[in-house]
């Protein structure tokens, strides 16, 4: 597997979850990753592609020249030599953005070796000239060819240059010609976009993200007592990286309208974000302790996901598995995992206030387990080899 991170964040955990199951069935698996640390129990799977310095250099070049995915040639060539020796039966791609790998070098190897490829697209980056999500600005340039990108300064940000037109056509050429490739999307919404992109005609399969229901379940704890929230209605938000597009400032707006009976709790913030938020919001930094996270989910009265663009957020699944109802904006694939009555228009703070006051919100029923996700992937592996 190839992904920007290993064992952390939603995509990194998906990789290690699959690796665990493969190992249990007697298979061998490696996760090649680009950045950040790996939890110790998963180091046996991990192979790092780029050093921290190489990631920084790639990031600087991407910001200066708007060429994300086209740097790190030396590191990628070195990685391909390792892959040649390892000689995998199948390659499973995940996020190829993140300032760690060169797509031209990678796909030259893939086409030359004609290995079966599964590519799980967690966002839209693969078929745009720049951005990973465009729903918030209703951009449709990706349908015919990106240019004059309105999200040039959005991730992966470019400070000066707009190379979205070149990037679009470069990706279209690089990703074409892979004979045995299946694209997997976590949501029907993203599958419909891929079908309209230059990947049209490629086999596409929807496999919903799954979560570890042995961990994410109603969990007792002392979270209320620890933070003095015994008599409060807790409104929770969780993200691996908070930003405006994740709805961070919508929580600020909401906090200004709530009375003292409520407390907003946000998990996953940076230290600087914590310092900037108003006192009405309890700000908690990132945690890799998923058992602790399950306790927080279970304690909350309502989970709010005001995302402006998301594929199939696992936080929705985790919260509901812990017994907490979820409300989300009508955007992307986020709506596919919650009851329809819990969905409101994007940016509708008044609508959010109405749902917050509702004491009878439901939870979506279904099998969102890790087991169903992993089994579907392994069946796909067997079909592809």
Model segments located where?
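Acidic anion/phosphate-binding donor-loop and adjacent secondary structure
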Residues: 192-195, 211-226, 275-276, 385
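A charged, aromatic-enriched C-terminal amphipathic alpha-helix characteristic of glycosyltransferases
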Residues: 357-385
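Nucleotide-activated donor-binding/catalytic signature segment of Leloir-type glycosyltransferases, i.e.
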Residues: 268-291
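Conserved donor-binding/catalytic core segment of Leloir-type glycosyltransferases
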Residues: 184, 228-246, 252-255
């Amino acid at each position: 597997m190839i992904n920007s991170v290993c064992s952390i964040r939603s995509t990194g955990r998906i990789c290690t979850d699959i690796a665990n199951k493969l190992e249990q069935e007697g298979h061998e698996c490696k996760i090649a990753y680009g950045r950040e640390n790996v939890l110790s129990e998963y180091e046996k799977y991990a192979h790092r592609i780029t050093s921290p310095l190489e990631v920084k250099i790639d990031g600087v070049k991407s910001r200066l020249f708007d060429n994300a995915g086209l740097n790190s040639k030396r590191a990628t060539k070195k990685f391909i030599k390792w892959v040649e020796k390892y000689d995998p039966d199948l390659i499973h791609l995940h996020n190829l953005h993140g300032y760690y790998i060169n797509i031209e070098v990678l796909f030259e190897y893939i086409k030359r070796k004609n290995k079966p490829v599964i590519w799980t697209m967690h966002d839209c980056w693969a078929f745009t000239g720049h951005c990973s999500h465009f729903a918030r600005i209703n951009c449709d340039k990706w349908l015919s060819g990106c240019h004059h990108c309105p999200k040039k300064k959005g991730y992966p940000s470019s400070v000066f240059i707009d190379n979205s037109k070149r990037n679009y056509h470069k990706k279209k050429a690089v990703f074409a010609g892979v004979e045995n490739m299946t694209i997997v999307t976590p949501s029907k919404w993203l599958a419909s976009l891929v079908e309209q992109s230059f990947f049209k005609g490629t086999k596409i399969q929807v496999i919903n993200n799954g979560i570890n229901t042995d961990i994410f379940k109603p969990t007792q704890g002392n979270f209320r007592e620890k933070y003095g929230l015994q008599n409060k209605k807790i409104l929770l938000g969780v993200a691996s990286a908070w930003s405006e597009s994740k709805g961070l400032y919508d929580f600020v707006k909401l906090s200004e309208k709530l009375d003292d009976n409520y407390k907003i709790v946000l998990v996953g913030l940076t230290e600087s974000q914590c310092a900037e938020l108003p006192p009405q919001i309890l700000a908690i930094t990132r945690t890799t302790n998923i058992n602790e996270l399950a306790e927080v989910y279970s304690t909350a009265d309502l989970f709010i996901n005001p995302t402006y663009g998301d594929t199939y957020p696992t936080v929705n699944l985790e919260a509901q598995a812990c017994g907490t109802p979820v409300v989300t904006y009508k955007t992307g694939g986020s709506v596919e995992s919650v009851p329809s009555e819990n969905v409101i228009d994007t940016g509708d703070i008044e609508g959010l206030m109405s749902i917050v006051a509702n004491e009878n919100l439901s939870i979506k029923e279904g099998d969102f387990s890790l087991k169903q996700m992993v089994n579907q992937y392994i069946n796909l592996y067997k079909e592809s080899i």
